[in-house]
Amino acid sequence: MNSPELVIVSDTPYTVIDQPTEWISVSKDIQLAARLWRPDITVPVPVVVEIIPYRRQDGTLPIDERMHPYWAGHGVATLRVDLRGCGDSDGILEDEYLKLEQDDAIAVIKWAEKQPWCNGNVGMTGLSWGGFASLQVAARRPKALKAIIAIGATVDRYNDDVHYKNGCLLNENFGWGTSLTAFTSRPPDPSVVGKKWRSMWLNRLENLKFFAAEWFQHQTRDDYWKHGSICENFDAIEIPVMIISGWNDLYVNALPALMDNLKGRCHAVCGPWAHHFPHLGTPGPSYDYLGSSLAWWRQWLSDEPARLGTEKTHLTFIKDSSMPNPFVMTVAGRWIDDQTWPLPSNTMSHLYMAKAGLTSKAVDAPPVQIHSPVDTGAMAGEWVPHCSGAEVAGCQRLTDAQSTCFDGDILDQAIDVFGCPEITISLQSNSTTGHLIVRLCDVAPSGSSELISIGVLNLTHRNGNENPIPMPVGETQSLQLRLDYAGHRFLPGHKIRIALSTAYWPFIWPAVENPVLTLAKKPACLSLPGRQKQEEGSVQVNPPIAPPASALTEKRVPQSKRQVTHDMHQGKTSLTIRDDLGEVVFEAHGLVTSAVKYESYEITAGDPLSSQARFGWEFEYSRDDWAVRTVTETQLMCDHYYYFLTATVRAYEQGKQVFERTFDHKIARMC
């Protein structure tokens, strides 16, 4: 499902040589499998590397073929590499973002620069994992790496990824841990690795990691999370960085962080899309990402690259107020092209929580309480939505009704919010633990409520994420919380709303207790960054382009279901999700793949310790008389003191079970 504005382009200046498998030795006994696209010319050209764990033969092939051939056809070679232990590559995947992974990437870069078709200049790119890796490897400074493009990435693995956020345990920590375990249970392709496919597969299964269990061992911002977090030393990156995200993506905060802290050239782009490449993402509108990225590669990877500078530029889509619709394919707004950073015309407005709502007058907050039902947030969508649809946050009215809300006056003129909103608040708690969730919403005249930004805090992390401190019961504590990066125009007739809650389930695993928080008689302030000259820098952008879609035959149509149910007798709320990703035949090599993911969450009213989560994946691969299947099932439960994690992985060949392993972990909880 792509943006309706996407333009298909087939012609390129150069014929492309497509080499489906190139073997790259990164150590004595480990070879990584790669796909190489390069222009059919005799002149050496630059090369861009993307190294990720998602299987180039099938997993990302439909995306790869709508990006890499375009660059190659315009004179920039590309390598799409399977990570160690993934796809057709040798070895075992031990964890995310290890130094070993970075070493492998550096070895690939060194290999690439020495090829006769390469001019010695290498770029690195990727979405999500590949974006993280690009930033991390750039900080290692391999000589041949001259520029990167990171999409949907983070500079802080603890606070701005899927694991934790300000001390709050994200349910995606367990969900993504399940997915990564399931992903690494899959076999290599016999058509690529030959007869050793089975021994490689069984070796992977026997050494399989239950990644979530490791991540649950690190509930504070310790050295585990500091490794690979670029924010620990921004100065380590000296090459030009293009950083891209979307307002409907989790990974927006890397943009201002890199723009504010890198000493060298940085270009940031933020549009309305979710967690995807911008030319393929929704909702739109998007821009010509492939043309823009090609110009970036040419600028920094040519035989005579541009002079390194310190310029900071930012292309931003400022979205207009609209009726919340998760399924919309394009939204209203305008593109802004800022050629300086920070913006000289930035403003900061302040609104205070008062008995009548939000006011510009600095007054003490009323002594209202914040105490939300434990299932507050059940209709909120996904933490990391990938496209338009039920994953994207919809109307917030139901969640607002379970929260303590403060509304501003009806606006008589438009107000732009651009930057990271902040809230300063003083409160008391009746518990030593708990969460505070703050949402910034746009309320339309009809009463619909649109989510603009969110901030979350484990109250024991109010003084930092490394050494939690229990909340003192009944004592006033002053807090400052930064919300996520936002770009939004509140239109006349709308209202600004701040919504406060103590729960946001199932996004956030409940704290041990669901506290009653009471605002103290002190000013509670919402600070909104904006633009003084709202129309300054408005531009028209070229529409997104992409090569034609891959040759696939659909045998089973993808289908997604998402249901929230309330058991009135037991007081139980359940969320069930089933994502059938369909069954397809890859015409290029005949592989048939099928994938189904399912999730379920439940919680009982008034009992935060009743929260449960179950996840599962089923993968099937076949070709001719070869057929394999893997099934992964996991469960998360808790009590006052521990998390209980279980997982079972089964593997089948020709319908016969050939492997089974069960994991069972009891982990002391700190959050």
Indicate residue ranges for each PLM-predicted region.
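C-terminal, loop-rich substrate-recognition/catalytic regions characterized by aromatic stacking residues
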Residues: P4-L6, P283-Y652, K656-C671
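Alpha/beta-hydrolase fold nucleophile elbow
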Residues: P116-S128
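Short beta-strand/loop motif that positions the catalytic acidic residue
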Residues: I237, I243-S245
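Conserved alpha/beta-hydrolase "acid-adjacent" motif
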Residues: L250-L255
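Accessory cap/linker subdomain of secreted extracellular hydrolases
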Residues: D64-E65, G73, A139-A236
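Glycine-rich nucleophile elbow surrounding the catalytic serine of serine-hydrolase chemistry
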Residues: G126-Q136
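Cap/lid segment of the alpha/beta-hydrolase catalytic domain
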Residues: D40-E113, V162, C441-S446
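N-terminal cap/lid segment of alpha/beta-hydrolase-fold proteins
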Residues: P4-T42, D407, L411-Q413
